Amino acid sequence: MTNSRRHIFERICAKAFQSSLTCSIFGFTVLLILYLLDWKRIAQVPGPNLLKDLEFQRAWNDLEYISSLPHPYNSKQNEHVRSYILKSMRELEATNQSYITVIDDTLTNITFESTDNDTLTYFEGDNILVKFEGKSKDLFPILLSAHFDSVSTGYGATDDGMGVATVMAIARYYAKNQPNRDLIININNAEEDYLFGAKAFASHKLSKNVTAFVNLEGAGSGGKAMLFRSSNGHVSSAYFKGNHYPLASILGNDFFKRGVIRSQTDYIVYEKMHNHTAGLDIAFYENRDIYHTRKDDINHLMPSSLRHMMYTASNAVKNLLNDSKSDLTKFRKPMFFLAFGKYWQLNLPIYQVLNIIFAVICPIVLLLTLIRFPSLYEQLKKPRYTVCFVVSCIFVSIFDTLTVLLLTWINPYVINSHTGLILALFYLTNLIALAFSFRAAATHSKLSSEDLSSIEIVFIWYAQILWYLVFIVSVILSIYFQLGSTYWVTLSYLCTFTCCIMTIIRINYFVDNVVTTQTTHEEDALIGSSINTSSHQHYGSTLNSTPHRRNSIALSNRAHVKLIDNIWTVIYFIFNVPFPVFLCYDILVETILPAGSQTLTDSVFSSKLYKLVIFVVFLSLVNSGPFIFRALSKKSLAVLTMLWITLFVQALSVNPFTESAPLKLSFVQMYDMDRMNNTVYVKNISPFTQDVLSLNPHFLFSNGSCNTSLCYYESTDPDFGGLKTPMSIHIEREKHQLDISINSGSKWCYVDFNTSVFFEAINGNSISGMYSSVRMGQRSFYAPYTLNLTITEVVKAEVTCLYDDIHEGIIPAYNTFVEHLPSWVAGVKASTGLLKVKSSIVI
């Protein structure tokens, strides 16, 4: 009775796992449930109870004030925000805690040369510094930094209002709790203008002994704050230690390093201070399309975003302050990644050494197994198998390439706001191409039923060979460019390697069961013979019971063998498919697409992002080839093909820009005082810019036109409050000595000469150098710029002063430009200065 029940159970299981599709669905479903449960945990943010010591509501109130209006460095609102922050920090000093010092840094002036040594930059800093003297005098200080200025076209709630609110909250906490080592806070200005605030701090005396820093930034708008960059593994561990809500990606390190993300943060300044300070760059990165736009306001934020930054930043600062090591710079480059719901950390050199070990040991192990199992080697070297796999991969590559070419030709910016659509399309493209090409190649090769039974194992080995080639390339890139973002290739390769080992175990198991299979065939023959013999017997005779018994045993053995085979298929699938799929999907959804999809309009269009995404998708699905080849029927392929056509047509026709992911058009107005004319320049993203400007009356009435990069038209003159000459230039000469005084009501002015001249001083600060251009930024709107020069010949110069304050009514052309934009378009600054007023002089 027991054997009978066992046989029935095995037959039911074999029936349940009767096809590769059923096995695949089973394995995939189990891991998908585990992944979704873990993803839900990862997606969580800290609750209000975890931030009681940081006074979250007060931080939110700070954020509301800071982001109430645009406050670029060159605006009156910037001064109001600065006064608010300084007053709040002065309150900490007023608590009479002797270890707190607040510094209103209006004394630091810096000068530096451009890389070609021909342009001089002069900048007057006005950072707000707070020093908390630590209990231990032997440990080097830690720096915490954020910038309080915004761009001229955005309210700066994420960039960087939340960073400033977080810094202020942490400052209040340490005003009540003296840190173990010195903590220096730099709430700096003019970050949006070439990181000048951080550069000013780097020349301040408080920066001299800083050993590590935490920089808070906003490279997107809202979402969760991610650890984008880290200098070494030791400071990285400070971020992860005790952090129950981490979000980090080593891809950020490499994206900034390789220029994939073009914008920069104060991190690059602090890291190069003195003896290469170690640090962390924690930044918001989602919704990059409303980054630097008027939608970067508090109405488009969730309190959970601020809570997450406050929690992760305070945790990192606490761990750095409590670190017993004085010098935190003498550690190796970091390496961290998310796998199995946990962040794993190791040093980059160790990761590279492990890669080399895997690259050598893994193929040796597999070659030794092939020597042990020559029958498998005979199968692997069959030309029809090799041709089937190679032709299939070539077909998939061609299909992927054609898909990308058509997509970027007809609707190149569709990925900007429809990343989910493009990702689904690319996954379906590769799934269909793999299934169709493998099936077609196998049919053309006329594989026998015996070949089909072994092709699953063969294709697993071929996929391993493909991954090995990709792995070798990734190892070379990792070593040559010092990249850690190739970890997903390493882990995926190890999955295929493990699966190959599992096939060896199965082959060994199958050999042990050859007798069972042979017995089944023999019994089949006996059954057939017995049935023919029994046809002449009477019903119910004793001879008739023997065939029935043998038939039952044979069917039971078949069910057992079928069950074992299909269980192995599930095991292969679990080891080979889900983890690479989830790993690749995670880096695409969490990092590559959020960081890259909304940057296509920032520079000249390139299809590199599409190619990268579809290549990663192909690699994530290539391991499924051995399964979908036999699992998907012709009807299934037909249904998937119809779905692919639907998605492809939608991707070609959908509007690439939406209200939540708008097209960003950069704006600048040039006002020439000599000719008394002005021209507005708008970045030309064809064909959208011309369609948008056709709604602007100034573009139509002035017969505006466009070239390949810019559209330009005449617009409303700037309003300087009744002044016809907003900029006055006064020159005093004495032999070869020349003093130039510029009054402009602007914090930014440039002077460009037609030849190099000798600079003696700027605003009383000694220079002594030959330059053809100077960029000047000063604290006061109304103080004149003074240049002391020495010249020996006639010199021509062009003076340009910049204006950014859109709420002072100085730039009505920008207000008109924004008023006539459709909801799916946003205006942004082209560079420092929405308005540039210039005048020429001859000396």
Curated annotation (Swiss-Prot):
Residues bearing attached sugar chains per UniProt: 96, 109, 117, 209, 275, 322, 677, 703, 707, 754, 788
Pfam families: Peptidase_M28 (PF04389)
Keyword annotations of the record: Glycoprotein, Hydrolase, Membrane, Metal-binding, Metalloprotease, Protease, Transmembrane, Transmembrane helix, Vacuole, Zinc
Needed co-factor(s): Zn(2+)
Topology relative to the membrane: Multi-pass membrane protein
Record GO biological process: proteolysis; proteolysis involved in protein catabolic process
Ranges of the Cytoplasmic topological domain: 1-16, 369-386, 439-456, 506-566, 630-636
Annotated compartments: Membrane; Vacuole membrane
Gene3D superfamilies linked: Zn peptidases
Keyword check for Phosphoprotein: no
Enzyme class, UniProt record, top EC level: hydrolase
Active site: 191
EC numbers, comma separated: 3.4.-.-
GO molecular function ontology, one term from the record: metal ion binding
Ranges of the Vacuolar topological domain: 38-347, 408-417, 478-484, 588-608, 658-843
Site feature location: Transition state stabilizer: 291
Membrane spanning stretches: 17-37, 348-368, 387-407, 418-438, 457-477, 485-505, 567-587, 609-629, 637-657
Family matches, as CDD domains: M28_Fxna_like
Binding-site list for Zn(2+) 1: 147, 159, 217
Main location, first listed in the record: membrane
GO cellular component, one term: cytosol
Name this polypeptide is given: Vacuolar membrane protease
